[in-house]
Amino acid sequence: MSLRNTAKADIVLKNFWKDNAHFADLFNAVLFNGEQKLHPEDLKEADVDLSSVLKFNGHLETIQRLRDVVKKTAYGMDFVIWGIENQQKIHYAMPLRHMIEDALSYLKEYNEIAKKNVDEKAANTKDEFLSRFKKTDRLHPVITLCVYYGEKEWDGATSLKEMLELPDYLENLVPDYKMNLL
């Protein structure tokens, strides 16, 4: 009797990239041309849940997103969030998906800072009170890498502007969002 392989590639890859040495090697090779900027011993597990409640004019909207693998590096008080998205099929809206997931990471951190500022009554000005964010507050960088392991060559967009019908006269007015693709 032979055993069937029922392993799911996405789960195998998530487990592989959770190893700090593999994770650091990947980012160093792909984003830093082999220079060791990330060190395995500096990487810490981070929350993969980006779910959020958005409030606009009294209307609530919930968004649920989970990242595949997320690590955090901390250098004193400063840190960076590093994310991996494994992708087996070409996703023609991947730049938009990355932008949304990165924005949700920033929103999550903003909400944590805003709550702390409100709890501590930390606003020094009306502007800080309004935004619940002090002039000196800063968010931390979020860097995401899409690891595409499909059989076909990636033929999708790698930036938001590649997804847009954009007249030349608007080119400089529309911000772009580029994704890191391997």
Predicted regions span which residues?
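Accessory alpha/beta interaction modules
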Residues: 1-182
